[in-house]
Amino acid sequence: MDGTVTPSPTTTAMPPVSALDAGTPTLPPEAPLAMPEQNLREGSLQVRHQRTSPPGIGVRRFYLIGGTFATTAIAVWVMLSVLWPDGISVLEGCLLGLFVLLFAWIAMSFASAVAGFVTVVARAGRKLGIDPEQPLPTLRSRTALLMPTYNEDPRRLLAGLQAIYESVAETGQLEHFDFFVLSDTTREHIGRAEELVYNELCDRVDGHGRIFYRRRADNAARKAGNVADWVRRFGGSYPQMLILDADSVMTGDTIVRLVAGMENNPDVGLIQTLPAVVNGQTLFARMQQFGGRVYGPIIAFGVALLHGAESNYWGHNAIIRTQAFADHAGLPSLRGRKPFGGHVLSHDFVEAALMRRGGWAMHMVPYLQGSYEEGPPTLTDLLIRDRRWCQGNLQHAKVVSAKGLHWISRMHMLIGIGHYFTAPMWGLLMLIGIGIPLAGGGIDLAGDLPFSPARYWHGSSQGNAIWIFICTMFVLLAPKLLGYIALLLNPRELRACGGAFRAAVSILLETVLAALMAPVVMYLQSRGVFEVLAGKDSGWDAQVRDDGKLSWPALFRSYGGLTVFGLFMGAVAYAVSPALAAWMGPVIVGMALSIPVVALTSLRRTGMALRRAGIFCIPKNSTRPRCWCVPPSCAAPLRWNRR
């Protein structure tokens, strides 16, 4: 009862790589498409209301904005009752401003989660004629499946492609698809291995003339440039292209339904699926995997319900109309130096915004299962990836004001930017929240009553401060609660997740671990924001996808300073008052225990032990499509000669 995949007995094992002298990979005849760079200073929104926009979309968005405003207004009114009696000082004004912004942030997530919960429970939200319960449609057009790669393990990569290829073949419609491995690899030994493993794959599945390999000599503009190069060379032959990631696996059934959705809706430019995170082995990966399974649909259905035909693009596991992409998604180079200037890093948001500006509808179909990806195995790997995303999202500050964008597209970018600024804002809120009673109550170590922030706040507001805390925690944790309720209402999913009790224990443990890691994430995200603002570029490295194996020296280098700071802060707080130390306890404990917490959650044996106990379970393999039997993580590790 888990999301771990084991190889199918019927799967042909990949032979070991014994040499690097592969034959020359083939490519189809070129069919160029012009893909001009878009001008961000000129342009207008071509179609304001899309034909495929769901009915009542204005009412839905009014609910989101109005619900967010109403919830925030109530919380601000209670906060004012805490601050107002003695007048509002400068520090209290700063506290109030931060509180308004941060509470509005979580209130918007709360409103989306409520909408998503209603949609999930009602089994609603299906659109574009894509119904997974109906017979598989017959396709009329050709589609290219693109798998970009950058210094990845070729055997792992192409095991995933084999899984997809065989699953598409099982639908009986393989003749409508071609498969492309688009390599941006810069390491020669990996590039040579890619060619060899590619040829082995073609021989094994008889994929010559249908599976193609192309390696760029100049990997300009990273993944966005990789895909754009393919569009300019081969895009004219394919009305649709399905973008994959190096760890993506999709079922043939899902792929065929996505293509049919594009064929039947000629004004749709993109359909984004909700990838389920699978193959987690470490404790960290398994808790992320479980959370994505239980809470993820609640959030995703809410987002899809409110965004309508202006949904976003996540860069992979999505199908795109090739001509629309070529006409409108050519990314310009941003003015200025890195990290804000240069090539657009988080290209997916910008490509979606430009395609919507060009008049194309953008949809998300979270109910369509059969779309999978893998998550980072450790918190460290997540934060390394998050640092790149931080730079890419902050770079959107140069794009959000582009002419002609739909206001929902601008909101996507502002939310991405805000996600990273909330980390330092939470830190400031906590520091000011402690600083106000210190400044107002004074520090009298010899007094009869020790200093207590709780006594200060309660005394100033007749207990209203505690209601602010309760309200904030409820709004923060509501998506987890709603996810659990939705799980209880789905007996099949509930059994697959270990039953009501084990699922509740899993949610509780995930919440505790997330709370312990929250100060670490807050600190490192804040540092990432300041590094980007200071002009430090994140670079571009291959993502770690194997089980975490973190050495103690590496852990001390990464988290030693944070641990020392947490212990120091705890000692100072205790010297002032034990009550102050208790008030700051969650942050102090998270920082002080960062090394053991990261180490524990990075262990495979810890994750597997909890799996055997029925904790952090997701539906068992037997309920999943056969394509899950050959995922990237099940391929034998590739060993090559580095010389």
Swiss-Prot record:
Transmembrane feature ranges: 62-84, 99-121, 417-439, 466-488, 554-576, 581-603
Alphabetized Gene3D superfamilies for the sequence: Spore Coat Polysaccharide Biosynthesis Protein SpsA, Chain A
Alphabetical keyword list: Cell inner membrane, Cell membrane, Glycosyltransferase, Membrane, Transferase, Transmembrane, Transmembrane helix
Sequence ranges of Polar residues compositional bias: 1-13
Cysteines engaged in disulfide bonds, as pairs: none
InterPro entries per the UniProt record, alphabetical: Glucans_biosynth_gluTrFase_H, Glyco_trans_2-like, Glycosyltr_2/OpgH_subfam, Nucleotide-diphossugar_trans
Record membrane topology: Multi-pass membrane protein
One GO process term, biological-process aspect: glucan biosynthetic process
Region named Disordered: 1-32
Pathway(s) it belongs to: Glycan metabolism; osmoregulated periplasmic glucan (OPG) biosynthesis
Location relative to the cell: Cell inner membrane
One GO CC term on file: plasma membrane
Enzyme class at the top of the EC tree: transferase
Keyword presence, Cell membrane: yes
Known EC number: 2.4.1.-
Presence of keyword Cell membrane: yes
GO molecular function: hexosyltransferase activity
UniProt family annotation: Belongs to the glycosyltransferase 2 family. OpgH subfamily.
Purpose of the protein: Involved in the biosynthesis of osmoregulated periplasmic glucans (OPGs).
Protein's recorded name: Glucans biosynthesis glucosyltransferase H
The species this protein was found in: Xanthomonas euvesicatoria
Upper taxonomic lineage: Bacteria, Pseudomonadati, Pseudomonadota, Gammaproteobacteria, Lysobacterales
